[in-house]
Amino acid sequence: MTLFSSISSISNPMTSSKSSISSFGSGTSMGSNSIACGGGCGGSGGILGLGLGLGLGLDLTGGSRSRGACGNGGNSGNGNGGMGGGNGPCCGGCCGI
């Protein structure tokens, strides 16, 4: 069972980052970069997890998409999060992977 909540029109004036859509719910992360990682981690953590995802995993580079780094067993994705350093650090901190 997965709950979906989309975040759109997220942009950074300094990097012209495109809008991102992330899925938040029962540990499933899909969408864009480290934001998706944070969303997957925050599935059971509610606002706290969501805050960590957006604050620590916010992608400032518009890099590659996450491949379910948190939700699918810990295979590190290709996110290039500027603040969080990508999916690895975010998932390591949020998910304990």
UniProtKB/Swiss-Prot annotation:
Residues 1-29 are annotated as: Disordered. Signal peptide: none annotated. GO terms for biological process: sorocarp development. It comes from the Eukaryota. InterPro entries: HssA/B-like_chaperone, HssA/B-related. Belongs to the hssA/B family. This is HssA/B-like protein 38. It comes from Dictyostelium discoideum (Social amoeba). The gene is hssl38.
